[in-house]
UniProtKB/Swiss-Prot annotation:
Cofactor: [4Fe-4S] cluster
Compartment(s) of residence: Cellular chromatophore membrane
Record membrane topology: Peripheral membrane protein
Residue span, 4Fe-4S domain: 29-88
Region (Hydrophobic): 1-23
Cofactor note: Binds 3 [4Fe-4S] clusters.
UniProt keyword Transcription regulation, yes or no: no
Gene Ontology CC entries for this record: plasma membrane; plasma membrane-derived chromatophore membrane
Its biological purpose: Part of a membrane-bound complex that couples electron transfer with translocation of ions across the membrane.
Keyword Heme: no
Protein name, as recorded: Ion-translocating oxidoreductase complex subunit B
Amino acid sequence: MIEAAVSMSALGLGLGLLLGVAARRFHVESPPIVDAIEGILPGTNCGACGYPGCRGLAEAMSEGAAPVTACAPGGRDVALALAAIVETDGGGGAVPGMAEAEPTVAFIFEDHCTGCMRCFKRCPTDAIIGANRQIHTVVTDACIGCNACIEACPTEAIVARVKPKTLKSWYWDKPRTAFEARGTEVAA
């Protein structure tokens, strides 16, 4: 019994050391811009952008093959942060190809749901709950708004709705200046 434990421990230690040496010897440095872009992306690896995960999108953005608006779950805030890194600012804080919109979540009309499980399988964050041939519903706190489930639904029972404001997601509006409050403009 002790011989087996000692031999397994020695084998584990030897293979661990071998993996450590291989990791150092065959390490490939990634460009720092790719790491910076990947750090800004949500990291859900949902594939809504059409790339294999957030790392693939970050590599494509660093090469200029993908627009900064490709990440739908990240929304406008992520697109603005990405525009600052890849230096494609649309001018004045605007991001080309992205309107300023409220975040959305999926909503299932339960009377149209057939329980086919296609939306359940496509959801990258497991925000849809339900069983086979049973009614499904969406957990709004877990939904990232990637709309993958909407495309997968054969009965069009899923729609995108504006994310409801809760105490977790509510923020004060940006204060207006005195000129904006009076409706006057500053003379140039």
